[in-house]
Amino acid sequence: MKTKARTLLGAATVALLTASTAMARPDQERVRWESFVGNIRTGAAGAVGSGTGAVNAAGAPWVATRGDARVNLASGNLRFRIKGLVLADTIFVGTPGNNPEVVGTLVCDTDGSAGGGNSVLVSTPPVPLSAQGDADFNGNLGSLPAACVNEPDIAFLVRSVTGVYFAAAIVREP
């Protein structure tokens, strides 16, 4: 009887160890960025990502005064806050221009190495962008694609609803 119990315990231990190594470690499940920087290089010259998943920078430079973003890769929970996201040039300088909404976008596998040369994009629903350039999202994106969970190169952008990005999150941890 003791031999059977030990065998079952040993099998259960091996199964648990195998399952735990296949799952993301808790310190790798959560990614955060502590700041945002507005796009400096405009158009394709400032693109983030690869192939069909590349996101071009907006046609004019933008600035952001502060913000942060956090994502739990295992659950799909994401939160971002950005303040002072405004144009740094054009006749609309100091305002968000004609952009009443923005989306937050994860750019997964930025070098395209896992996706045949293409990055994978996952975006939030549109959220309001105030006249002062403030936007906030807190929600769940659902199950994230493998490129987001398994690849270490992930970027976070705040974009227009038409696709170009205004700001990139910087200082990624971990």
Q: Which residues make up each language-model segment?
A:
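Hydrophobic residues positioned within well-ordered beta-strands of beta-sheet architectures
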Residues: 67, 80, 102-104, 137-139
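Bacterial N-terminal signal peptides that target proteins for export
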Residues: 1-9
